[in-house]
Amino acid sequence: MAGAGGGNDIQWCFSQVKGAVDDDVAEADIISTVEFNHSGELLATGDKGGRVVIFQQEQENKIQSHSRGEYNVYSTFQSHEPEFDYLKSLEIEEKINKIRWLPQKNAAQFLLSTNDKTIKLWKISERDKRPEGYNLKEEDGRYRDPTTVTTLRVPVFRPMDLMVEASPRRIFANAHTYHINSISINSDYETYLSADDLRINLWHLEITDRSFNIVDIKPANMEELTEVITAAEFHPNSCNTFVYSSSKGTIRLCDMRASALCDRHSKLFEEPEDPSNRSFFSEIISSISDVKFSHSGRYMMTRDYLSVKIWDLNMENRPVETYQVHEYLRSKLCSLYENDCIFDKFECCWNGSDSVVMTGSYNNFFRMFDRNTKRDITLEASRENNKPRTVLKPRKVCASGKRKKDEISVDSLDFNKKILHTAWHPKENIIAVATTNNLYIFQDKVN
């Protein structure tokens, strides 16, 4: 499987697993988002309990190639608390829907995190010195009586144990009527967008009390509503361009230079439906759960229920590549509809060189597709392979007929074990995969 480096086949091996082993998982511990920062040295996860946990790549071990995939807890903080909307009598969950890192400009790191309604800008900074020797203040912070000061001292900085502080710098609230599903930082690093089911807003990172509505698909009569916005993202290089996907399987590319309200798209990406595949579930499974631009900005990837599609921005009428993630589930759509799994929102990600794409599946399986060799592989995130440097064995699912020894039957897949969130290190072959409440880190095997 090709990775950040290019076309050679890669053996993936286990590096770490984070989180408790319990079968009885608390709802608050379920991981809801995973994101590497721009250098890959930090990895953030958000959970349903409103917490953000940041892991840092082991600095000493970066030189030792077999330990590159070791991450240790750097900072943990409560990003969002549960709230109650008294006007609508609605509870607002604390669950973190998305995390996005800003590029590092100084010693501190900044990230955006959002729940259903409120976006917060967090500053993550280190402190390893503290001031000492104030004239009018005791070491515990109490003020002295100025009349007791007989000599003047020059305050000095003394070394202390490293402290990592997370402080909220901005809170962007009261701009979304519906649940926020996406945030995306613009390539100008000054603005970002936030999208809910029917609207997309544009924000400036310094201004919290005002945002511009750039897309509004809400009909005058809500009975005429036929689709909702499912994801949105800014282009990585062109600061005026963004895309948003819909529950009908379409992707619209908009140019903010054309008009203030981008209700008219510049391009519409849509694949004509094959009439022979039409069924009751067609519209549900064509809903796009994630859209991601390639690092180069030439392509974008979309994930629907059964497949991953790669689109060339210059070709709207069909994708240039389609990869079947779990086609063997097509015959199971009826039972997946009954247990609500058909509404699961799987995400997808690119590797650093845009040559491989990755997405999750059921039974704690995740899939990789090599765009150059057209090879694909299914791997499993499991504690059975949890010795460091254990090479992951490819898994195969048997759809029908006789099952070979190393295959797993489609009927024995566990639909409660699912990988919705994955992330790929921007520069190395290190991947982070979230199962229910565990974070697995895998890396390529280096001889």
From Swiss-Prot:
GO MF terms held by the record: enzyme-substrate adaptor activity; protein phosphatase 2A binding; protein phosphatase regulator activity; protein-containing complex binding; tau protein binding
GO cellular component: cytosol; glutamatergic synapse; nucleoplasm; protein phosphatase type 2A complex
Keywords linked to the UniProt accession: Acetylation, Repeat, WD repeat
Tagged with keyword Repeat: yes
BP GO annotations: protein dephosphorylation; regulation of chromosome segregation; response to morphine
WD repeats: 11-80, 94-174, 175-218, 227-270, 288-325, 347-381, 414-446
Positions bearing N-acetylalanine: A2
Tissue: Expressed in all tissues examined.
Domain of life: Eukaryota
Domain observations: Has an extended WD 2 repeat that is important for the interaction with PPP2R1A.
Record's subunit section: PP2A consists of a common heterodimeric core enzyme, composed of a 36 kDa catalytic subunit (subunit C) and a 65 kDa constant regulatory subunit (PR65 or subunit A), that associates with a variety of regulatory subunits. Proteins that associate with the core dimer include three families of regulatory subunits B (the R2/B/PR55/B55, R3/B''/PR72/PR130/PR59 and R5/B'/B56 families), the 48 kDa variable regulatory subunit, viral proteins, and cell signaling molecules. Interacts with the PP2A C catalytic subunit PPP2CA. Interacts with the PP2A A subunit PPP2R1A. Interacts with TP53.
Family assignment from sequence similarity: Belongs to the phosphatase 2A regulatory subunit B family.
Known function: Substrate-recognition subunit of protein phosphatase 2A (PP2A) that plays a key role in cell cycle by controlling mitosis entry and exit. Involved in chromosome clustering during late mitosis by mediating dephosphorylation of MKI67. Essential for serine/threonine-protein phosphatase 2A-mediated dephosphorylation of WEE1, preventing its ubiquitin-mediated proteolysis, increasing WEE1 protein levels, and promoting the G2/M checkpoint.
This protein's name: Serine/threonine-protein phosphatase 2A 55 kDa regulatory subunit B alpha isoform
Species per Swiss-Prot/TrEMBL record: Homo sapiens
